[in-house]
Amino acid sequence: MAPQSAVDRAAMAQAAQDIEQSANAIRGMQNQLASAKDQLRSHWEGDASMAFEAVFNRFNEDFSRVLKALDGMHESLVQTRITYEAREEAAQQSVNRVQALLNG
């Protein structure tokens, strides 16, 4: 017997929404941190300030990679759901055609 597959489209949609909300919250935090860093740097000069800037920039790059990954997961979930629904609809139409032929 072939393995069966079940897809919970509502759960898939909820997961996509949760990921999008999380990414938006993280973007907000990233913007707040950048603003706080800019404010701090406006009153701070010297080698320590420049070292902090370099570390912050690396941290911000990592932050951006996380956001890119979240955006990718969101897009994949959305596209997978769209593809699944289209295939499910096509399969249902095929079943309906066969049923119509059998019913004469």
From Swiss-Prot:
GO cellular component, one term: extracellular region
Family annotation (SUPFAM superfamilies): EsxAB dimer-like
Keywords: Coiled coil, Secreted
Highest taxon in the source lineage: Bacteria
Coiled coil keyword on record: yes
Compartments it resides in: Secreted
Record annotation: effect of changing residue 102 to A: Peptide of residues 95-104 no longer disrupts EsxA-EsxB complex
InterPro entries: ESAT-6-like_sf, T7SS_ESAT-6-like
Coiled coil, from the record: 12-43
Subunit structure, interactors included: In isolation forms a homodimer. Forms a tight 1:1 complex with EsxA. Forms a complex with EsxA and EccC, probably wholly mediated by EsxB; binds in a pocket in the third FtsK (ATPase) domain of EccC (residues 1163-1208).
Family, similarity comment: Belongs to the WXG100 family. CFP-10 subfamily.
Summary of the function given for this chain in its UniProt record: May help regulate assembly and function of the type VII secretion system (T7SS). Binds to EccC and induces its multimerization. May serve as a chaperone for EsxA.
UniProt cross-references to NCBIfam families, sorted A to Z: WXG100_ESAT6 (TIGR03930)
Protein name: ESAT-6-like protein
